[in-house]
């Protein structure tokens, strides 16, 4: 396979050599806003590719532009050196217990990686000859836009973590995006002063930039795939219900995150309450939204990000204090109704979708619980108080009936633990993992897939990633000692070289490299054609079938390079259990997600 790939590189080089505009080994690209001077990088298999880093896709959101929608980028004269990553958006990563606040408010930049650029105006702009248009479009590469995870409060599109080393062994253009995070990106007063969803609007602005400029990098603006993990995966899903995103992308991949998950949407009233809590802590008037926003625009970004400690009750729970929110209707609004209503009333964009989970998603939380002995004791002792808040059903379904809350909580305890105490033994640990996995990730994905096949004509491809590699993200989520299985985010290691930064002392095994071959092959093919397995190969020796039946959804199970199989009814008994809980909560809670009976 590698010999064939090397031959492909040689052929591609011969095709593209006449299209490059290279100065002293560095590529030049002309965009609508100005000329870029890029750099070169090498892929895992030794391919030389072109990188343009720190490209502005919006004006810096500073001063009066803080808490405002992104504005068009400012054009520049001369040549902009796009050879280094821009600053990351200001943040503090509570998931790894980061102490310092890092980054900058001037952060709306993206990176573009390409195997071949079309550098001149003549090469980038199609003429009016239909045959030449067809040939040039065919020669362009599919585009993949990456939205990072991190709970909409941490992360970045930087090359050190989400670089092209693995994916650019295939013929595609990769775009990675920074967007505003935490209260700077997701605070909302639930009115027109600060309606919210700024981070999602940043993403949409980046998508517009790609649509207008990606041809200059050899990309096909009519073959764009959004993909993301965790909050990035949920972001992709949100763009699928936004009519302003229509036409800017053509396929979506949501890894370990979609808007059915309970941490992805703020209940009415709560977003405003948190905005007021933040403002009051910083000495701002909370009499009205206008005064609050004007006051917060005068505060430092560090002060605003530093309020994250105000909202923590059990570790970093409740999960993600500043999230997407339903906005009042106005021009440019990103979300004006519960996205579940959008899906069930036919307003989800009908594009191919790929989604799935890792086998132990809940390790993202449970490693932090078991990494500190007092947390395990607290969970056992105060289960009735912690679980409704931490699993988010108290907020999501606005449970005001104490008897109902206690009944649901007791049902959860009995299902996962029976009469056993929650302690340090392995059985207990993995049951806590299952509980968080199902509540935060698995059940929402199960519901999303079922609704998709009922309401859409495009295919949905469902997967279960159960490959245990050389190292796990659980080691940085709070416990470097114990085993938690295949953690949330573990799949990232086989699409991007994140491990080189996060786990520098771990060398990828031969099996890890085979998993990179598998994952990049599947992701590339989906981006290229909408079919993740167009043919049976040695790398993936079967066809991945889309989901056809809601009563027993088909899915691809990835365990190792020799065990990739089709199966159905993923975690079925656990999903039936959560179906019953959700039904009870929606029937008896005061939920804003209390949808029509027929839904």
Positions of predicted regions on the chain:
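Extracellular structured ligand-interaction cores
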Residues: 52, 105-109, 142, 350-351, ...
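Substrate-gating cap/lid region and adjacent catalytic-acid/histidine neighborhood
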Residues: 295-513, 597
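Classical eukaryotic N-terminal signal peptides for Sec-dependent ER targeting/secretion
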Residues: 1-17
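Acidic/polar loop patches that form or flank catalytic/metal-binding clefts of enzymes
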Residues: 287-289, 304-307, 458-463, 529-540
């Amino acid at each position: 396979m590698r010999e064939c790939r090397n031959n492909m590189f040689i052929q591609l080089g011969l095709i593209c050599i006449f299209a490059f505009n290279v100065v002293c080994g560095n590529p030049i690209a002309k965009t609508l806003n100005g000329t870029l001077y890029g750099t070169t990088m090498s892929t895992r298999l030794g391919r030389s590719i072109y990188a343009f880093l720190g490209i502005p896709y919006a004006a810096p959101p500073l001063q009066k532009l803080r808490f405002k929608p992104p504005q068009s980028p400012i054009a520049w004269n001369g040549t902009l050196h796009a050879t280094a990553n821009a600053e990351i958006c200001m943040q503090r990563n509570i998931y790894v217990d980061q102490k310092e606040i890092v980054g900058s408010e001037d952060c709306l930049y993206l990176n573009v990686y390409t195997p071949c650029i079309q550098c001149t105006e003549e090469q980038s702009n199609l003429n009016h000859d239909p045959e030449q248009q067809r040939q040039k479009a065919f020669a362009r590469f599919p585009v993949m836009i990456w939205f990072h995870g991190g709970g909409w409060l941490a992360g970045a599109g930087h090359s050190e973590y989400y670089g092209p080393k693995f994916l650019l062994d295939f013929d595609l253009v990769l775009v990675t995006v920074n967007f505003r995070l935490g209260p700077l990106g997701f605070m909302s007063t639930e009115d027109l002063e600060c309606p919210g969803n700024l981070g999602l609007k940043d993403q949409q602005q980046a998508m517009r930039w790609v649509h207008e400029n990606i041809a200059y990098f050899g990309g096909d603006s009519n073959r764009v795939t959004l993909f993301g993990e965790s909050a990035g995966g949920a972001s992709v899903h949100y763009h699928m219900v936004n009519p302003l995103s229509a036409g800017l992308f053509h396929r979506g991949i949501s890894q370990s995150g979609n808007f059915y998950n309970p941490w992805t949407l703020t209940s009415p009233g709560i977003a405003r309450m948190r905005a007021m809590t933040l403002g009051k802590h910083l000495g701002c008037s909370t009499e009205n939204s206008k005064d609050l926003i004007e006051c917060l625009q005068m505060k430092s970004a560090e002060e605003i990000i530093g309020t994250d400690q105000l909202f923590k009750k059990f570790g970093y729970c409740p999960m993600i204090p500043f999230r997407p929110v339903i906005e009042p209707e106005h021009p440019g609004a990103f979300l004006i109704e519960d996205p579940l209503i959008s899906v069930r009333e036919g307003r989800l964009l009908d594009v191919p979708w790929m989604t799935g989970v890792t086998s132990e998603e809940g390790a993202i939380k449970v490693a932090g619980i078991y990494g500190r002995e007092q947390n395990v004791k607290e969970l056992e002792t105060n289960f009735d108080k912690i679980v409704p808040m931490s699993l988010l059903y108290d907020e999501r379904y606005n449970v005001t009936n104490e008897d109902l809350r206690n009944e649901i909580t007791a049902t959860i305890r009995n299902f996962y633990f029976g009469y056993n105490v929650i302690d340090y033994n392995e059985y207990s640990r993995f049951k806590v993992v299952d509980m968080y996995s199902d509540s935060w990730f698995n059940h929402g994905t199960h519901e999303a897939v079922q609704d998709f096949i009922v309401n859409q004509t495009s295919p949905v491809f469902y997967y279960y990633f159960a490959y245990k590699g050389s190292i796990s993200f659980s080691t940085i989520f709070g416990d470097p000692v114990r085993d938690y299985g295949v953690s949330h985010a573990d799949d990232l290691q086989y699409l991007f070289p994140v491990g080189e930064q996060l786990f520098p002392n771990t060398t990828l095994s031969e099996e890890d490299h085979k998993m990179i071959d598998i994952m990049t092959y599947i992701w590339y093919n989906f981006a290229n054609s909408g079919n993740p397995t167009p043919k049976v190969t040695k790398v993936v020796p079967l066809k991945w079938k889309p989901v056809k039946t809601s009563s027993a959804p088909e899915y691809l199970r990835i365990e190792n390079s020799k065990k990739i199989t089709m199966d159905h009814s993923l975690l079925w008994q656990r999903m039936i259990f959560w179906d019953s809980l959700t039904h009870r909560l929606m029937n008896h809670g005061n939920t804003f997600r209390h949808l029509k009976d027929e839904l």
